[in-house]
């Protein structure tokens, strides 16, 4: 039996693999990667590597084995039919008879277009008959704290979210939840709504940035069309920019406030405070 992690060299995947290695022997972990060279550090620690690509279904033939636990980390290629990509993995997992397939989805409360592929993937997974766990991940601190250059250049946080609040958490928090599911028992056919312990507004985020930098950083709430133009001017492709503006609209409606406590319970600790993520982002 192996614990198999797809997208293992991505931001979340790397954290999952590293945290798995704190709990299970390396030979029980398989990292699915597109580029073996990017996973050399995993191989050096004894992790098994499997080279496969969501866009090449044949590369998943025989990759899984009966009894495996699989983490399907959602793809980030918004223009390549993510549902089809995910279905490739689900079909291969079903053919192998895996013991569990956990999928990193989106909050059940999210109505933004970002959620569409996740909802469709969930339906494919449920229809497969596989034992499943839906890890409905909320928003990541790092979406904001790893992109501070424009904020610091203009002394302003800009969002089309009004006074809306969100309960984000760090990638490491979501990774810890996934590891708990992959290494624990009793998670079959469960859905977890995952978010940070504390909700915050963009005005509060700007205030925290001001506190840590000693500068006056404002929050500018703008219409969605204005935010779309800003993102496109920054070189973000329109499809992704539109998705991000849609998320802002969902934040304005409170759709990214997740108050279940599922994330901290699975992680076995409180979630990472926003202030800590801001400090890390400022250090670069």
Ranges and model annotations:
Residues 38-45, 62:
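Short loop/helix-cap segments at secondary-structure boundaries that form the rim of catalytic
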